[in-house]
Amino acid sequence: MSKKPVRVAVTGAAGQIGYAILFRIASGEMLGKDQPVILQLLEVPVEKAQQALQGVMMELQDCAFPLLAGMEAHSDPMTAFKDVDYALLIGSRPRGPGMERAELLAVNGAIFTAQGKALNAVASRNVKVLVVGNPANTNAYIAMKSAPDLPAKNFTAMLRLDHNRALSQLASKTGKAVADIEKMAVWGNHSPTMYADYRFATINGESVKDMINDQDWNANTFLPTVGKRGAAIIAARGVSSAASAANAAIDHMRDWALGTNGKWVTMGIPSDGQYGIPKETMFGFPVTCEGGEYKVVQNLPIDAFSQECINKTLKELQDEQAGVAHLL
């Protein structure tokens, strides 16, 4: 019995991350090799962007993906989000030269207020929303606050790129396979203040912290490397990381939809008060996923260094939220 197609909205669909993600969604990498999808693609109402989107759709057609049950181009979120089961909000305004962070928050505030309202009006009531466009946590917070009729838990922000970056640094440091690392956690904001925490991590049952046993490396090499990896990629390639961001978005959605089999992953989610994080703050937590729901890993001890890191990233998030309060 073949499954009924699900509707997947992708914003910024003709952008770099969009180009890196759409073919993987259509091939079944995100929702499973037995799940047909209808792609509802949103781009800005500018002729050049809409034309580029048509080109991407031509390529998608030319792949003849068996699971691609349909696709549509849109310039209005009210039509793009109609009845969607999954929404990947990738499109956002990047920070231009000389642009203040407050300006960036205001411009994106307008985009994500409109998209949150559209999801509220027309999306499936069980829609799973992932915000990739930066500042991801605050954009997700804005969308969530603009959609009062949808459960807050349906809105998430992407911390998986930080999580995957941390895994690869640990694999490289220990000389072990990245797939063998379990129980990695990333706390906080998707920004250089995020706190990648391997205190609980294991490789084949052995403690990674004991294996590395170097707090100086943790504080002065590991955390800055993971936190500033995006900037390092821009410096090397001249453009921001798109393929790795697309890959992290696929990982995030796949795990949320299909489950993690008890493995820890990191998701930016509205806090329910866990670990002293104020309610509704869009914050990275270690979670496990099962049956289409995520659950925060509870009762982890937080030492003084970790608390300091968590407080720092929380303060940044609270400042960002305060900066958009007037838009909500």
From Swiss-Prot:
Keywords: NAD, Oxidoreductase, Tricarboxylic acid cycle. It is an enzyme of class 1 (oxidoreductase). Coiled coil: none annotated. One of its GO terms (molecular function) is L-malate dehydrogenase (NAD+) activity. Its EC number is 1.1.1.37. One of its GO terms (biological process) is malate metabolic process. Pfam families: Ldh_1_C, Ldh_1_N. Substrate binds at R95, R101, N134, R165. HAMAP family: Malate_dehydrog_2. Catalyzes the reversible oxidation of malate to oxaloacetate. Belongs to the LDH/MDH superfamily. MDH type 2 family. PANTHER family: MALATE DEHYDROGENASE. This is Malate dehydrogenase 1. It comes from Albidiferax ferrireducens (strain ATCC BAA-621 / DSM 15236 / T118). The gene is mdh1.
